[in-house]
């Protein structure tokens, strides 16, 4: 904390300098008519704005002549001074140009995330007014940097995808590998893609009611079947982190921001502490690359009149995201709602223009997901809601340091969060200071106000029902207390609302950097008019100085949240009984009971299944979310344990011989029949003697096959 505070001092000083640069009044720029206007770039290069205004002047002059009977009207874009040698530019409506000429720089439309929706709504002729981005080598370098950062985060897993696991996620790593395996098994066997009986046999698991990422598992099924679920998990994590950053970079470039600004914003969205934290075992919260694409498609609805096509594409994208992760989509929708309300206050959002496309998108998506959603809430093994203990962020976590960040104290960080996969805040002091300066300096931009409000509201929601400071309740109610019992929202962990602040803060940084580059560019051009002898290299350096200073300030603010590699520990070895073909002689269509039974803290049997021909046999119980067996159909983690499972759990915990009574033996045999168990398997490892000897009192002496003890219990079902 002290180190972060010390670092915040130079950040604050540099931010003050940057604020002075950005707040300087820009020099007037002369138009072709001799009048002056204060130009604020809104996603267009200066040359394109000048050309558009010149064409507008020509049209006005020609039409004046026509009114006097001295000439014919001139179409927009036919200005004789424009010879067409430059790259073609989008048509700019006259209303847009007129609005630009009647505004000051401070009042001009923002050039960032919501630029498309905050400019004049509806391009003429249905033409897309977002700048078309031609990707070049510089863009590929940015994406390569994102891939390199993702490799750095996962570096301890490289070369150990099947022998190591992300241990700070407890068993989440294995759980998601199992989900990828289940999707591949369903594809290979033409089974229901929304259900699997490969764990919790014979009841099975409702995949739609779990974070099963079928939207990635199904298309990646060939990879899983060819190389295994371990490889699929690594690929999804790697491309999820890098792809999310690259998608936001693309989104910001689509809004017209310069490359350095978009690169910094994209990096923060892809590698914020929350993203790195979820990389410990939550690929559904790592693979967020569709969210900026969906947002871009929403903004396109304000730019052109192809509502049907854009609406259909929007619906398809939303549908895909639902199958990847519903909760991230819900969080984005809340963020869009907050930003939209602020823009509506400023009258910078035309809901009537967007409504047809949004309605079409909603209809397409609802048509495609109606049955899956019915299955999720009313199908086999569905449940209503699941109880979570208070899961709000500690207030100190908002400016604290995450576990996997450079120079942090892991124990101090751990004390401020639920667990290592839910460090959803931890933005650091310097980033908050810089964001505050940006909001103050650029406060007249509606999009800056909207992003600032979004960051505050998201973090306020993330505090839960009551503000807690360093583990001590303050008695101050938080915003979440107003919404925690609403349908759907009741299942959301409030700590995750802080993730909505990530793109908000990234947008603020990107807008400020872009403004710095454009501010220095305009001043450089003004200087060129009075200094014709200036060398091109010196001029280019001078024009971009403020922009690179802004990048440096942002880098200083991001330094405390630079990620370190995730912790990887060795997996328990898979018995050769499963890596070879021996298991086939003991599996005959029923289940295998792993001892101790699989649950949220011991999912080693998942590795057995994945090693044996990708879930070729089902197992008893498991790690999933399912119904609790009560009339209210509430949810719970894992299966409702039968007496035999509870007994094995107690024996394993006590590590002492326990002799079963006659009544217990009868009950345990009934449990095995209910599970339709073929074989009970106990691997040979340390501390198995108590379990083995206790099982002897229930099932008799086992057979030793390679490196496991096995009991054939098929006879109990006859």
Residue ranges of each PLM-predicted region?
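Extracytoplasmic
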Residues: 552-718
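Start-transfer (signal-anchor) and selected internal transmembrane alpha helices
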Residues: 90, 94-96, 106-111, 118-157, ...
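Signature aromatic-anchored transmembrane alpha helix within multi-pass, membrane-resident enzymes
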Residues: 337, 361-366, 507, 511-561
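Membrane-embedded helix bundles of polyisoprenyl
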Residues: 146, 237-255, 260-345, 357-373, ...
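Membrane-interface coil-to-helix junctions
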Residues: 148-244, 272-288, 395-412, 469-471, ...
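Membrane-interface helix-loop-helix junctions at transmembrane boundaries of multi-pass membrane enzymes
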Residues: 346-358, 435-477, 524-534, 540-544
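Membrane-helix boundary/interfacial segments in multi-pass membrane proteins
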Residues: 166, 278-285, 415-416, 423, ...
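Periplasmic/ER-lumenal interhelical loops and adjacent helix-loop junctions
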Residues: 167-186, 354-357, 361-439, 485-498
